[in-house]
């Protein structure tokens, strides 16, 4: 079972400049959205930048998570069960200036 992940707002820079990924749910070990977040943190190109994506076991404040265009806050957050064909978008609202 595959899902699509998009990385917007500069998050692609943490993932070798990949703006979109296709991932197999079997690679995550669980169908929970929290497992996807853990997996994404593990594949960050530079481990020293992990804290730019994850904080205390979840995405850091300032990163919006959408599942099939719905805010994850409405979908049980980390407990949401991913399904075949789901599209998960991570959007960073944190910008320098």
Curated annotation (Swiss-Prot):
It is found in: Cytoplasm. InterPro entries: Beta-grasp_dom_sf, Mopterin_synth/thiamin_S_b, Urm1. GO terms for biological process: protein urmylation; tRNA wobble position uridine thiolation. SUPFAM superfamilies: MoaD/ThiS (SSF54285). Pathway: tRNA modification; 5-methoxycarbonylmethyl-2-thiouridine-tRNA biosynthesis. There is a cross-link at residue 97 (Glycyl lysine isopeptide (Gly-Lys) (interchain with K-? in acceptor proteins)). GO terms for cellular component: cytosol; nucleus. The modification 1-thioglycine is found at residue 97. Its main location: cytoplasm. Keywords: Cytoplasm, Isopeptide bond, tRNA processing, Ubl conjugation pathway. C-terminal thiocarboxylation occurs in 2 steps, it is first acyl-adenylated (-COAMP) via the hesA/moeB/thiF part of UBA4, then thiocarboxylated (-COSH) via the rhodanese domain of UBA4. Acts as a sulfur carrier required for 2-thiolation of mcm(5)S(2)U at tRNA wobble positions of cytosolic tRNA(Lys), tRNA(Glu) and tRNA(Gln). Serves as sulfur donor in tRNA 2-thiolation reaction by being thiocarboxylated (-COSH) at its C-terminus by the MOCS3 homolog UBA4. The sulfur is then transferred to tRNA to form 2-thiolation of mcm(5)S(2)U. Prior mcm(5) tRNA modification by the elongator complex is required for 2-thiolation. Also acts as a ubiquitin-like protein (UBL) that is covalently conjugated via an isopeptide bond to lysine residues of target proteins such as AHP1. Belongs to the URM1 family. This is Ubiquitin-related modifier 1. It comes from Schizosaccharomyces pombe (strain 972 / ATCC 24843) (Fission yeast).
């Amino acid at each position: 079972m595959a899902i699509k992940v998009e990385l917007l707002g500069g998050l692609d820079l943490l993932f070798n400049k990949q703006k979109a990924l296709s991932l197999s749910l079997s690679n995550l070990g669980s169908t929970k959205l929290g497992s996807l977040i853990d997996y994404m943190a593990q594949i960050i190109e530079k481990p020293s930048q992990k804290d730019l994506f994850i904080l205390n076991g979840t995405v850091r404040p300032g990163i919006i998570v959408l599942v099939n265009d719905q805010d994850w806050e409405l979908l049980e957050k980390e407990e949401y069960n991913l399904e075949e064909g789901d599209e998960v978008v991570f959007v960073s609202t944190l910008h320098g200036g």
